[in-house]
């Protein structure tokens, strides 16, 4: 299978390297990733600057842009044939609940979807871990199954894997997105020149994390697989808004 592999942690990230090693024997892999860490980039595109691509010693390609840029330039310009699958990851850290809105990992997969391709975003629920190899093995299982049972071209799967050795992962659960409380207060500081600066604080605590959610599956030791749609219409609210708008 022809696979385009990208991420948001950058071309030198451990999760990217481990996933490439796990898949390269059975698949034709092209790796195009940002030249730096782009965590939190969401779906941003570099519209105000040209993109440059450089091949690394590893054979991976580094782009001076965002995760979405990497997939866009790969599919729309660099590759001679469209990939059959876009995979983004393995991300260093979870992408659960509201995280997907900000996630460059999910954004790279979403860009694949915009290109008309099935796509998977993969995250390990730890920033540093000895379990990236285990996570990569789990991804290989999903890819092997996908070969035999293809996904629709407009399908995005958001996969989160618990920080456990391979043999301790209990299985896979199909989940819905949970939800977090609002983010914690930003951290105010002063730079060396006496100017006020702000750092983002911790993410919000889990709010909707009950059975059926991605949060709950991870807490129980399962891999969570959440189907995502790029249609952000709140369909259940359409009639309420129609009624509301008539009163203006």
From Swiss-Prot:
A divalent metal cation binds at residues 8-9, 39, 91. GO terms for molecular function: 3'-nucleotidase activity; 5'-nucleotidase activity; exopolyphosphatase activity; metal ion binding; nucleotide binding. Pfam families: SurE. SUPFAM superfamilies: SurE-like (SSF64167). Its EC number is 3.1.3.5. It catalyses: a ribonucleoside 5'-phosphate + H2O = a ribonucleoside + phosphate. Its cofactor is a divalent metal cation. Keywords: Cytoplasm, Hydrolase, Metal-binding, Nucleotide-binding. GO terms for cellular component: cytoplasm. Binds 1 divalent metal cation per subunit. Nucleotidase that shows phosphatase activity on nucleoside 5'-monophosphates. PANTHER family: 5'-NUCLEOTIDASE SURE (PTHR30457), 5'_3'-NUCLEOTIDASE SURE (PTHR30457:SF12). Belongs to the SurE nucleotidase family. This is 5'-nucleotidase SurE. It comes from Pseudoalteromonas atlantica (strain T6c / ATCC BAA-1087).
């Amino acid at each position: 299978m022809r696979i385009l592999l990208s991420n948001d942690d950058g071309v030198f990230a451990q999760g990217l390297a481990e996933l490439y090693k796990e898949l390269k024997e059975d698949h034709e892999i092209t790796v195009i990733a940002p030249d730096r860490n782009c965590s939190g980039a969401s779906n941003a595109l570099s519209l105000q600057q040209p993109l440059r691509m450089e091949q690394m010693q590893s054979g991976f390609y580094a782009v001076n842009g965002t995760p979405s840029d990497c997939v866009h330039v790969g599919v729309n310009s660099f590759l001679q044939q469209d990939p059959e699958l876009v995979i983004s990851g393995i991300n260093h850290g979870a992408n659960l609940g509201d995280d997907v809105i900000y996630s460059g990992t999910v954004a790279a997969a979403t860009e694949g979807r915009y290109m008309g391709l099935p796509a998977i975003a993969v995250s390990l629920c730890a920033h540093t871990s000895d379990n990236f190899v285990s996570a990569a093995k789990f991804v290989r299982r999903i890819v092997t199954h996908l070969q035999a049972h293809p996904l629709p071209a407009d399908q995005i799967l958001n996969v989160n894997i618990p920080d456990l050795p391979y043999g301790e992962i209990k299985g896979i659960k199909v989940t819905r997105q949970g939800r977090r409380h609002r983010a914690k207060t930003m951290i105010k500081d002063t730079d060396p020149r006496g100017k006020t600066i702000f750092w983002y604080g911790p993410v919000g605590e889990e709010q909707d994390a009950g059975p059926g959610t991605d949060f709950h599956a991870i807490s129980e030791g399962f891999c969570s697989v959440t189907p995502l749609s790029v249609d952000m219409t709140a369909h259940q609210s359409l009639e309420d808004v129609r009624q509301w708008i008539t009163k203006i």
